[in-house]
């Protein structure tokens, strides 16, 4: 069963024109005077998925952690004047202490011209002042530089802006642009610091940026963020769609359980694929470290100091992951995000295989970006836009439009595709801080129940908030099914005010697929928009090649995130009920007898303080 991770850390008036020569502090002040960030949430607006109170939002940009103030910062594509995409497009800004509840900050910066866009980019912390933008008055932990795309007059170029106040206001670099290849499809730079394997190397900045309509991710290096050298390109890999967007390259922990045999004071042997290059000795130690195929591993023995047995240990190495979004042309229609697992030597990325891997198998998960840094400098955290360009401008919300996904923690793990094949996968788990959430008394557990067609279980919520988590473990008796019968386990998430509006999700044994039906709504958009796919499914193999399946879900008013098999498969989708019709009950049923057993169903409803 998947567990939520607790993070380990101690609008604008239509008359406002966001221009470079405008005073950004004044813009922020005016925004704050016309928007009450502490006001209660709209009835259908998500509570723990970030969304601006007003205006349009799309791709996440510039994610970083302020170690001085212990604040998390996200920026995003933002048009504050209407709930649809428009120009001038700016960078919005929000801050959080816990990655769960966000404080909206308004516009961080924007382009000079009203017909221009400050398109997507990233944020770095220039600790060592390689750019020369800072002096001793700015704490090294707050020396943030934004690298972003200016889209204007048929050209896309890369720009720099820097902040002297911890990311709240920005000054544009006077010698912009820092990269111009005479292209109208050259965008979305993601920058990180590359140190290399040699701890004595000076290191340098690395940028991935999309040459969108050529299906290329260009890889540049720089000593100072201002002067860039093209090193290589990663091109025409995986699923192309119409064009590449929002690339990113990140070093991700690789975690694998394997078998070891040992005795106190002696050598250790490992059966795993990432075993030591040479013999490793220890004496009553609870942890060791080794190198395997030049991949550093930090090993923690599962039985602490009692090591005189054969048991399991957790191998932790790393691999590099190239993330590429594409739009349109996803296999589900519209927007999609894929990734490649491989190796990076500072100039070139090489995937380990030709497998195309999709980051999320739902309809509403796009443009993932990872945080530049985290408190322990090991965790890889990221956030995506929870919408789809096929219909994002038309979804029935007002005065805001669209939300972000939950923050996720990423690791590379092994995944049983079927009983004979194991592959690597980018595993993801949601990050929420429960200290920001409180139960409202609705907590329900259902255990050891065999379903039949003549009865069903009903879970009633008290004072429905529309925000809850659920964890479902179930087993399937495959010997008792007929292939001509729709053999379902179904959960109906029904609206409290109108039960004709509901989500239906569950599993069908013949197809071995988990399904979601989001089409039962009275909202015209849901019924009439042909791109708002009503019925979706994902392959859901059992856990550890057994007959037991598990799914964890978070429902947040108009969005549902599903995590299968401890996060090896995910599906993120929006849904839309009538205003204020929060989910008030869950009905569990099956159309067949003695096929499904509910081993455990746990539901907790939350308020947000």
Swiss-Prot record:
Residues 1-14 form the signal peptide. It catalyses: Hydrolysis of terminal non-reducing beta-D-fructofuranoside residues in beta-D-fructofuranosides. One of its GO terms (molecular function) is sucrose alpha-glucosidase activity. Coiled coil: none annotated. Substrate binds at residues 56-59, 77, 119-120, 187-188, 245, 389. Its EC number is 3.2.1.26. It is an enzyme of class 3 (hydrolase). SMART domains: Glyco_32. Keywords: Glycoprotein, Glycosidase, Hydrolase, Signal. InterPro entries: ConA-like_dom_sf (IPR013320), Glyco_hydro_32 (IPR001362), Glyco_hydro_32_AS (IPR018053), Glyco_hydro_32_C (IPR013189), Glyco_hydro_32_N (IPR013148), Glyco_hydro_beta-prop_sf (IPR023296). GO terms for cellular component: extracellular region; fungal-type vacuole. PANTHER family: EXOINULINASE INUD (AFU_ORTHOLOGUE AFUA_5G00480), INVERTASE 2. This is Invertase. It comes from Kluyveromyces lactis (strain ATCC 8585 / CBS 2359 / DSM 70799 / NBRC 1267 / NRRL Y-1140 / WM37). The lineage of its organism: Eukaryota, Fungi, Dikarya, Ascomycota, Saccharomycotina.
